[in-house]
């Protein structure tokens, strides 16, 4: 049993957001110190078979940190040192936001899940942009861009554009987030016309590589519309998926009825199904997100069409060596199945 598993019972006595903040402070304390290099040497799996080239980026391995863990771009270097192949910061909004009242993050320990209703709490595009510009991360850094709560949907294009222009110099790729369930009216921007307008505005402003993050709660027809927008505009990829507002009957935890987006093990199969659905309809690279907490769940996303994957909830339950453990496991799975690289395994189950 590793150190994190020994500490986890004590950490889980804390409020979920408080525990997250504690972990964040530890990583912030490591970042930029000699200890960061020691951590990187311990956690990083270096093997050319893990390398993935997708949407103009070279990822040293396919396992990334999903948006939400480092909302303000404060610890991307430290997260990279944990062995992740990329880090996505944000969601970042044009204006600073306090987010929703606490408590707003809940563990569903029996279900290996989280529910959050954070509400895009962040320092705002001006401050986050300055941090990103000063960042020299060892892995690609993506920037997840959300809409300010104060901005009407009719003003969404200008709001997203303001944020993009402030973070443009510090991001390696950019993600339009229209799928968080915790900003009123945001998911309405997933309609074809609104999505096309927002993405087109950012493209015209030079945003590249540009991806869109979709909800798992969309209908098949709505997903197909989004794919058509991605194809028509020549976008670089799709992230599938965000959290869900659905509550599977299988949930057992007391917090299951809390309002917000559900992530973790209960959405594994649904998110994989959506990855496969998208991969059957487009050759655009897909970032698979949802319920990844070990090599097998990451491999399943990859075999169903994901070029790279991301996790957040898995980090809460498995601890800071999760990227190392997944990458080691992926190498064994590739050897077992006769693949020369991760890229060779992408989409083989479609």
From Swiss-Prot:
* Cofactor remark from the record: Binds 1 FMN per subunit.
Q: Looking at the keywords, is Translocase present?
A: no
A Pfam family annotated for this chain is: DHO_dh
Q: Does the keyword S-adenosyl-L-methionine apply?
A: no
Bilayer topology term: Peripheral membrane protein
Q: Give the E.C. number(s).
A: 1.3.5.2
* Compartments where found: Cell membrane
Keywords recorded for this protein, A-Z? Cell membrane, Flavoprotein, FMN, Membrane, Oxidoreductase, Pyrimidine biosynthesis
Q: In which pathway does it act?
A: Pyrimidine metabolism; UMP biosynthesis via de novo pathway; orotate from (S)-dihydroorotate (quinone route): step 1/1
Which cofactors are reported in the record for this sequence?
A: FMN
Question: Which catalytic residues are annotated?
Answer: 180 (nucleophile)
Principal location listed in the UniProt entry: membrane
A GO term from the CC aspect: plasma membrane
Q: Where is this region: Disordered?
A: 249-268
Q: List the disulfide bonds.
A: none
One GO term (biological process): 'de novo' UMP biosynthetic process
- Annotated catalysed reactions: (S)-dihydroorotate + a quinone = orotate + a quinol
What family does this belong to?
Belongs to the dihydroorotate dehydrogenase family. Type 2 subfamily.
Q: How does it assemble?
A: Monomer.
Annotated protein name in UniProt:
Dihydroorotate dehydrogenase (quinone)
Q: Give the source species.
A: Natronomonas pharaonis (strain ATCC 35678 / DSM 2160 / CIP 103997 / JCM 8858 / NBRC 14720 / NCIMB 2260 / Gabara) (Halobacterium pharaonis)
Which lineage ranks, top first, belong to the organism behind this chain?
Archaea, Methanobacteriati, Methanobacteriota, Stenosarchaea group, Halobacteria
Task: Provide the gene name from the record.
Answer: pyrD
